[in-house]
Regions:
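Glycine-rich flavin
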Residues: 39-46, 52-151
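A short core secondary-structure module
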Residues: 149-184
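Charged, amphipathic alpha-helical oligomerization/scaffolding segments
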Residues: 17, 239, 246, 281, ...
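C-terminal helix-coil-helix/basic helical segment that borders enzyme active sites and/or dimer interfaces
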Residues: 26-32, 287-322, 339-347
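Glycine-rich beta->alpha junctions and the first turn(s) of the following alpha-helix
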Residues: 190-287
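Charge-rich, acidic-biased intrinsically disordered regions
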Residues: 260-271, 302-319, 344-362, 388
């Protein structure tokens, strides 16, 4: 039975409990990749009550905000970022429904969400001239197309699908995962975030249960993009924290001091002055990333799901952009520095510590970090308002 979580502190405690369950099996799930669906890990997440924490109060949910979601995601990502990423789009779709869904759509889908059922995504496509050049179409109430990078779709109850309608307008359709004409593949073959199993989904005249005008969501000041990016940032910061934790544990229990460190008087690896300097610097940067994430989340709490003005929307978007850009850099850095700190033995395959770097590098290219810095600079130097889309 899925529990209900109504308070921030309870959500954080639950996330830590889930993380404690996930951590021992993270390396095994990484090695298995798409060859084994992480059913037990996902069941722990689904049964925890965390899937429903952002459902609005008006729709029967607890209505917890970005600060709660960011902290929950960061904690779980530090244990297993693949499992943390599975519900990333789930929370975005909840936000879209909350703002743009009609009462019938919200009741249908939020009832399932509050019962511990997930919303998966089928938003991305390949082969077009650009990322928004969609081929998937809705006509006559059915959906036809092929989607890639469908995180969460394989084991979800519903799939949110971006498509063009008869008029060429962007819409968001919801179809049952087990409905007619829906086929989700396990062809996810990448170096990192392997247990997300973000494979290909094919829709062949699949009946659509709910349709939302998605284009209009980004034609007004909005925070959907910023809130979606906040969870992406939390995954990166969680990876950084997990890498730092494993570096600390390895240094304390397995690493030996180098010849030069012994000559300098070190009795253990943790006494090596260069290790101490590098670790201290890295720990500071990881904590800075955590602080920037928390600050961005607090800003989104203040702005709200529907911003009062373009200025408020800009404030939220830029706060998250900074957290996402810096968090991505620190995640890759921490995962690489782990080996410089811990030494050659830490590269042994049996430890699977390279999964931190593979996860960070794979997830960090979800969308370009350089454009985050570009828009931050454009606003501060020239008062140029950032764009309004799903990645900002």
């Amino acid at each position: 039975v899925t529990q209900r979580i109504d308070r921030h502190d309870d959500a954080v405690r639950t996330a830590q409990r889930v993380a404690d369950l996930l951590a021992p099996g993270a390396a095994e799930r990484d090695r298995a990749g798409a060859d084994a669906v992480p059913a037990e890990a996902l069941a722990a997440l689904d049964d925890s009550g965390l899937l429903g924490i952002t459902v609005p109060v008006a729709d029967g949910g607890p209505g917890l905000g970005p600060s709660t979601l960011a902290e929950v995601t960061r904690i779980i990502a530090a244990a297993d970022p693949s499992i943390a990423q599975v519900p990333q789009a789930h929370y975005l779709l909840i936000d879209v429904l909350a703002v743009h869904g009609d009462p019938g759509a919200r009741k249908l889908l939020f009832t399932d969400v509050l019962a511990g059922r997930r919303l998966g995504n089928a938003l991305a496509e390949r082969g077009g001239k650009h990322a928004q050049d969609l081929k998937t179409r809705i006509a006559g109430g059915v959906l036809t197309g092929v989607k890639y990078y469908c995180t969460g779709a394989l084991t979800s109850t519903w799939i949110g699908v971006s498509a063009l309608d008869d008029n060429g307008r962007l819409v968001l359709a919801f179809v049952p995962r087990d409905g007619d004409g829906v086929a989700v593949d396990t062809d996810w073959d990448v170096m990192g975030q392997r247990a997300t199993i973000s494979g290909t989904t094919t829709f062949t005249a699949a009946p659509v249960s709910v349709t939302i005008d998605y284009a209009s969501a980004y034609e007004v000041p909005q925070q959907l993009g910023a809130r979606a990016q906040l969870t992406q940032a939390a995954i990166e910061v969680g990876i950084a924290g997990g890498a730092l934790r494993d570096a600390r544990d390895y240094l304390r229990t397995k690493s030996r001091p180098s010849t030069e460190a012994v000559r300098a008087g070190a009795q253990a690896a943790v006494d090596d002055p260069h290790v101490m300097w590098r670790y201290g610097r890295l720990a500071t940067r990881v904590r800075a990333a955590e602080a920037l994430l928390a600050s961005a989340a607090a800003t989104l709490d203040e702005v709200g799901l529907v911003p009062a003005s373009q200025g408020a929307a800009t404030k939220g978007s830029l706060a998250v952009a900074a957290a996402k850009a810096f968090g991505s850099e620190v995640a890759v850095e921490a995962a690489s520095e782990l080996f410089a700190l811990c030494g050659t033995s830490s590269a042994a395959s049996k430890y699977d510590l390279d999964r931190h770097w593979r996860n960070a590098r794979t997830h960090s290219v979800h969308d370009p970090v350089d454009w985050k810095y570009h828009h931050l600079a454009a606003y501060e130097l020239s008062d140029t308002v950032p764009p309004s889309h799903s990645q900002f």
